[in-house]
């Protein structure tokens, strides 16, 4: 059994066996008797490295044995291994020639937080969002068949990710094309199966054995010649398995279901995977693991230890903190507004903690809806609620709202329904990298007719603009970033602002900075040196055209600033207005460039994009020099 640790090691642990398994090829040269010791060493090393860098924590600890077994049995990278989401991929990175690079995890120019094709040939598919693995692995399996190659395709997906419709679409299609592939359900929440023991492991060995598989295929060939006989036999087998194992749903979808088995039992994992490797058609293995396995605090609190920050050196000064987190301001606003309006309903696609809906869910459980990883459903659910006079608020990360764009337009906006979108993690998100960045929401929202799009500059504005959007007659969106605000005093009253009106924060000379969002603080830092006017625009749509017209008539240069893609963003809205009205004033658009900004500290990412104070000042001075 895996050893259980109670503290994260600060010193690098001795890992003599892991040192001999830097690649899957080296791993496969070890004896099976060595694998359990290897698992203990890998878990200790994982604890140590994540303690040094911070990062996703519990999921990786839970798949140590599964990761070892997969690379031990399958011929990776020739066999294709696809991890869903990627939270659990750190052990995979350690075993695939990146152990000595783990100290650079999530740092600028270092290892990414998720599997990346550009990083390693063992990362067969780039991930970050959930529920994509089965579709990707199926595509690889079909390609292998068409290319005449014998390689295997394996997808590892969690029970949470399996709630998304995309996963079931792929399961259904795979059975239709009779794909030779293996899906492994990593059930680390016990949400599907609650009992795993000797009987389940024993049955898995039998049902995945070559003898059973050969007998099954032979019987199929014989009985298929007799009308109705094979169907009767198939149903009999299905019912018998259904009495003992919980895989009826997957059997009905056309998959050969094996499990559940103990995901921390290496001998059983290796034996079962070896058997299933050679089986034809769509195979489904149900593995039960414990999130945070081997680290006692994470086992007791898997949500709290989903990810951790790096350990601080003993005696180091406490980090300076800013104001409250923007998500916390939203969470408090939601509770306050719910107390005033019984029609308010809160919806989240599996982001209760991240979006700060915990307090709301406890105070108003009957008005709180966690729809799991189902963004499309979340948006249309809100639309249905709005049809009946309710006031739904969808709390969702910017990057995940992309997955429900059709529902946003077709089900909400076209019908002009009262749905408020509280869009968290807008802009750059730091160490999680481009898959989690909210780089495009202004661009994809401002083109939707009737949509109210707002960009608060601080905590107080966030609260006011949430109220404004909530009271608006139609669909509204408020975007706000990850992290803390500048500690601006917050008005406790639920007061809206006038729609489509920005605020001039400073009057200056020939340059006007038009700020959409939290870069206001950076703009104010350089305003005096540039003698610039600073406008807190607040609204992307409707744009404060009167303010833009005024500033265009009294300044020699307008500069739009936003933490969104320049292409199609708020600056584009300003440029379109200037062109439409024939206002001949130069416009400099500052925002996110036309490439994916790689993972780094948020400050490093903003500096790269020229959105910190120094970058803004440099860009403005260079433009003035050319005029």
Swiss-Prot record:
Pathway the protein takes part in: Metabolic intermediate biosynthesis; 1-deoxy-D-xylulose 5-phosphate biosynthesis; 1-deoxy-D-xylulose 5-phosphate from D-glyceraldehyde 3-phosphate and pyruvate: step 1/1
Catalytic function, reaction form: D-glyceraldehyde 3-phosphate + pyruvate + H(+) = 1-deoxy-D-xylulose 5-phosphate + CO2
GO cellular component, as recorded: cytosol
UniProt xrefs under Pfam families: DXP_synthase_N, Transket_pyr, Transketolase_C
Gene Ontology molecular function terms on file: 1-deoxy-D-xylulose-5-phosphate synthase activity; magnesium ion binding; thiamine pyrophosphate binding
Cofactor(s) the record lists: Mg(2+); thiamine diphosphate
Residues binding Mg(2+): 159, 188
Keyword Cell wall biogenesis/degradation assigned: no
PROSITE patterns, sorted: TRANSKETOLASE_2
GO biological process: 1-deoxy-D-xylulose 5-phosphate biosynthetic process; isopentenyl diphosphate biosynthetic process, methylerythritol 4-phosphate pathway; terpenoid biosynthetic process; thiamine biosynthetic process
Recorded superkingdom: Bacteria
InterPro entries in the cross-refs: Dxylulose-5-P_synthase (IPR005477), THDP-binding (IPR029061), Transketo_C/PFOR_II (IPR009014), Transketolase-like_Pyr-bd (IPR005475), Transketolase_BS (IPR020826), Transketolase_C (IPR033248)
Keyword hit for Phosphoprotein: no
EC number: 2.2.1.7
Binding site residues for thiamine diphosphate: 87, 128-130, 160-161, 188, 295, 375
Keyword entries, A-Z: Isoprene biosynthesis, Magnesium, Metal-binding, Thiamine biosynthesis, Thiamine pyrophosphate, Transferase
Textual note on the cofactor: Binds 1 Mg(2+) ion per subunit.
Entry function: Catalyzes the acyloin condensation reaction between C atoms 2 and 3 of pyruvate and glyceraldehyde 3-phosphate to yield 1-deoxy-D-xylulose-5-phosphate (DXP).
UniProt cross-references to NCBIfam families, sorted A to Z: dxs, PRK05444.2-2
Subunit and interaction comment: Homodimer.
Assigned protein family: Belongs to the transketolase family. DXPS subfamily.
Protein name: 1-deoxy-D-xylulose-5-phosphate synthase
Species for this entry: Pseudomonas paraeruginosa (strain DSM 24068 / PA7) (Pseudomonas aeruginosa (strain PA7))
Taxonomic path: Bacteria, Pseudomonadati, Pseudomonadota, Gammaproteobacteria, Pseudomonadales
